[in-house]
Each structure stands twice: as structure tokens, then as C-alpha cells.
Amino acid sequence: MRGIQTPVRNVRRRIFKEIAKFGYEQRNLQDLEDLPYEIIPGEVAKYRDSIYRERAIVGERLRLAMGMSLNPADKPTRITKEIDESNISEKYYEPPLLQVIPSACNECKEKAFIVGEQCQGCMAHPCMEVCPKKAISFKDGYSYIDQEKCIKCGQCKKVCPYGAIYERKRPCANACGVGAIETDYAGRAKINPDKCVSCGMCMVNCPFGAIADKSQIYQLIKAMNEGAEVIAILAPAFVGQFGPKATPNKIKAALLDIGFADVWEVAVGADAGALEEAKHYVQSVATGKLPFLLTSCCPSWSMLGKKYFPEVIDEISNALTPMVATARAARITSPNAKIVFVGPCVAKKLEASRRTVRSEVDFVITFEELAGMFDAKEIDFNTYEKEEELNDAFGAGRGYAVASGVAGAIKACIDEYYPGTEVKIDHVEGLAECKKMLLQAKSGKKKGYLIEGMGCPGGCVAGAGTNIPVVKAQIQVKKFVKEAEDFVHPETAQY
């Protein structure tokens, strides 16, 4: 549902807009108690069984947008409970990052194969013959699946000549490539933090908007209000994210208008990272010191490797991620600035909270959250005309935003600066496929390879914090790549 302007996205956007307005207008945070009535007006529910439930859900969304955790559902409480703790101009984060709002969950049934009304009770009944657990029988003249015996292999569905067997899927669980979505005592979805790698795919695939992440936009705006020098570093996926008329130069001008002191392309850090990883590959993999090299720019991919495949930790590149490399570059000229990563990625919020990174990056917001900030300041790119040149990076770094772009950039650097070096590359996208690739690498099937992993199917342009359809985003990124030079220069690696 990414890129489709559904009611779920409309509510999320409105929440971010209102929180941003509270920040810019420096309103009393106790007034947040009134917002559910402004966002959900009237007396009749539109999407739920009760307008009171709709407002309660909005209240929980407001808390998450302030960086706070959900309130307990079984105790009397207020939206603004402990609000003073988040009323600061520094990064505020209460784990976990992603949470299921219990009152918003539809309690969708778990995965199962179901016989539909198209079943003809045919003589061949191939479904019964292929079932490895003998879970299918005839009942009242039709096929019947015993869910207690079924192992959900799907063989029956494949062989039914009438297409009468369908797969029921729980959208959030189906989108999760690591099996982190479980079920609580009431049949609602819950996220197992020990399994989750914070890609956010469950969030964007829930049709009821029951899963949300925490935001830092209020604290960011408060820092601006206090006079801090705040620099935005834009992830390569930013082009096209704010509409067809929002050119890179207009986006930079708009960012300056809403309070940022300067704007950088994170592709600058990606250019440096591509060179560094090219060097790493040539010196370590091409010489046989390492069996393979895994890219490290996608935090969900890196987290997957470290959490599920600790044996490959040494093969994960130790090059600075583009976010960190760009933040360091920006601090060379502005050592006292607060650095804000603006990108498509939910997991970057966790990366920036790590002990080794938190001093480099002060805030992380998504394109979706930035759109809410633009709304709060009434920036409409259909009529906005200001421009400021934004042309910091080369094509290799800009291409990091699309799947295979990272490996392609590194290979381009190897071909350019280490001619004659043979390089084998592979890439995967989506956590389920990433797990398969790591299993292959672990078992020795990827010797000599440079392997790029992207947690989101499609790459960064398909991240949970994006605003437009993936295909449109890919087109815009590739166009922006062509507008730059093809390769980075060696001196870029100083960052």
C-alpha cells in the first residue's frame, strides 16, 4: 500500500502535521488532549465500530509521534502522561521503536489454507492425494482441511483444478521476513523484539494502521526554536518523494524555509562508502583473506546478519554507513551543528541510537514525517517556486537508493580504480530473501562475492517512511543519477 493515499496514510500525515505545528507554534503540550476531537470530529465513527475507539487510537498515535510509548490499555490515563520527558530538544526514544496499538488491531486470523465455495467435490480430489499430513478429507461432499493437522505447505492449493483453495494471510505477518509477528492472548498481533529488525514492513502493510513507529519531529523542531544550527542530510531516495513538482533544488529551499540551516545529500557519504568498500573487497576478498563481503548500509540487513547469523559478523563491511559518513563530513564545516538524517527508513532511527553513532547523528526523521512538517508550514510544492542548488554528489552514491545500486556502485569503483580485479556481485531484497542469501553465504556457496542486502523489497525507495509508489521512486532516482557524474573521486574517501 506504499504510495497509495489511503485513510490510514491520511491519519498518519495529519498526526505528523499536528505534532509539527505544536512544535513550531510552541503550544502548551497539555492541549494535545483536545487533538483527537479535532482529527476525528462529529459523533459517528467512520472506520471503526465506535468513534470513542477511533479517538483512543489517535491518542495513542499522538504519543508515539511524540516519541513516547503506548499507554496501558487497562488503566485510566491521559495522552499527556509523562509528556514533560519528551519535551526536550534532544533525541528522545523509548524502546521499542515499532509498536502494535492494541485497540487498532483487527485481530486478523493467522495464516491458513481454506477451501472455498468453488470446490466441486471432484472425483480426482488431487488436494487429498498430495497432502503430506493427510489433513484433507471429504465432508458433506466437499474437501475439508483439518487445521490442526495442516502444516501450511500449500501443495493442495497448487493442484486444485478449480482454484478453490485459497491462502488466508495476516498482512503484517505475511510482510515480515523474520517471523517477528506473533499473537497475544486476545488474538491481536504483537511484535517479538528479539526477532524484529525494525524494517517497518509490517507497519506499511497493516490495512488498519495498527502498527506505528516513534517520531522525533517535535524534539527536532524544539531544537530549531532554541536557535540550534540544524543540518538536514537527505538520503538518496528523496527525489520525487514530495510530488512531481518538488525538484531537488525546491526541496532544499523548502528545508531552509522551515528552519534547517543547511542541506546535504547523503549520497556524498555513499560515494565515500563505495570507495571504501571497493578497497575492502580488493584487499580482503580478492586476496582470499575473507570468503565474501556483505554491505552494511541497510541497518535491517546488518541487524539480520548479526542477530540470526553471528558467524558472518566478520564479513559485514565495517565501512561507515552513508548516513554516518555524511554526518561527519557536515561536522567538518559545522562542528556544533545538530545533524538530522531525513530518509525512507524506520530502522535508521535505531542505527542513530547506537552508542557508536548517537554522537554523529542527532535526529532521524522519515520522508513521511518531513511531509507533515511541510504541511505544518504550509509548503505546497505545486505553487512553491524558491530554489537552492543541491548538487553535492556523484551518480554512484545517488544510485544507493535502489536495489542493486550499492553493489553496482562498489563494482564501478573497483572497475575504475582497481582495473583488472575480478569481482563477483549478488544482491537480495526483502528480509526473507536476505535470510536465504545469508544461509548460502554461511554454507560456503558465495565465496568471492560482494553481497548487497536490502531489507525492503525494491531497496531504500521502498522503505516504510516513503511517500510514493516504488516504481515511480525508482524512475526518479535513476534520472537523478544520470544528472550527476558517473564515478566518485578517491579524495572523497577522506570522510
Q: What does each model-identified segment do?
A:
Residues L98, P102-A112, C122-C127, C153-C156, ...:
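Cysteine-cluster motifs in flexible loop/terminal segments that predominantly coordinate metals
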Residues A124-Q147, Q155-N192, V197, M201-Q216:
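Iron-sulfur cluster-binding cysteine motifs and their immediate structural context
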Residues V115, D146, N192, L234-A235, ...:
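A secondary-structure boundary/capping signal
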Residues E54-E90, L97-L98, C108, C122:
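Core subunits and conserved enzymes of cellular information-processing
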